[in-house]
Amino acid sequence: MQVEVDLPNHPYHIKIEEGCFSEAGDWVSHLWQKQMITIITDSNVEILYGESLVNQLKKQGFTVHVFSFAAGEASKTLEVANRIYAFLAKHHMTRSDGIIALGGGVVGDLAAFVASTYMRGIHFLQIPTSLTAQVDSSIGGKTGVNTSFAKNMVGTFAQPDGVLIDPVTLKTLGNRELVEGMGEVIKYGLIDDIKLWHILEEMDGTIDSILDNALAIIYHSCQVKRKHVLADQYDKGLRMHLNFGHTIGHAIEVHAGYGEIMHGEAVAIGMIQLSRVAERKNLMPRGISQDIYNMCLKFGLPVHYAEWDKDVLFDILSHDKKASGQFIKIVILPQLGSATVHQIPLEEMRDYLEK
């Protein structure tokens, strides 16, 4: 199956098919007539898929280089980006060449950031191998690196030339790495796709159930992401709905130390916490927070953060991109399957951090 992202300035397609990674070289050759490609990946994914992709691309006549960095959120930094710039320059990569991001969300965000800034921008493709990347971060053109102050504090908007999603790659993930992706999937059902929410309700929450339903949940998630990106490419309106749970979630990631709490795990905790307080403030119907709690618990996502410190978390989220002056925008749910943006005084976020 295929999802078309029909942006007027940069249309591209998302190919979703079991086993399609084995045809990645052919897919790339139909999109690009470039001479040189650099694959950016991490130390885990390189072992699993690096050699296969290199061989496929060489078979199509491409000159191929590989840059691999230590796996994990701690590598999503300007320091690692600088190392990649040096690698690209050493191999004389030009704007007529291309980058392929092969891996999970960290790889995709970092590789896309590098591609969008090296020589003021070169073309890139996304081949996501984690559930979080397949349903969310590889789509829509947000790139970024972390700082000590905030997650994704430095970044750009840059669309890929295409996205290749093979659900079979999920079978090589560890259980925790697979389950954390369900945080984003649950979010999609909550904000815009009640059919997806019902699919999740029918699943038993096991690893096998995630893998068995992967094609459906990836497709539904990509459709929701596509809708929001087409309506609001630069995150000024509707696309902000995708941030449900992320304001508190990102603060948790920073507080815990990048990589200690995975992104989807932090989003799950953030959705539950924000919803509970929004219900107390009569901004959301009673019971939704419990629905979210139960769904996250069923799939094995964390529902609490043991090191909770509201003052430190508030200081972190005051640097959030959704803050503007003395106000910040949060996403709430009028009902299951629907979202809206609500602006509040930044100081009121302290209420949302009360346990």
From Swiss-Prot:
Keywords: Amino-acid biosynthesis, Aromatic amino acid biosynthesis, Cobalt, Cytoplasm, Lyase, Metal-binding, NAD, Nucleotide-binding, Zinc. It comes from the Bacteria. It is an enzyme of class 4 (lyase). Signal peptide: none annotated. GO terms for cellular component: cytoplasm. Binds 1 divalent metal cation per subunit. Can use either Co(2+) or Zn(2+). InterPro entries: Dehydroquinate_synthase, DHQ_synth_AroB, DHQ_synth_fam, DHQS/DOIS_N, DHQS_C. Its main location: cytoplasm. This is 3-dehydroquinate synthase. The lineage of its organism: Bacteria, Bacillati, Bacillota, Bacilli, Lactobacillales.
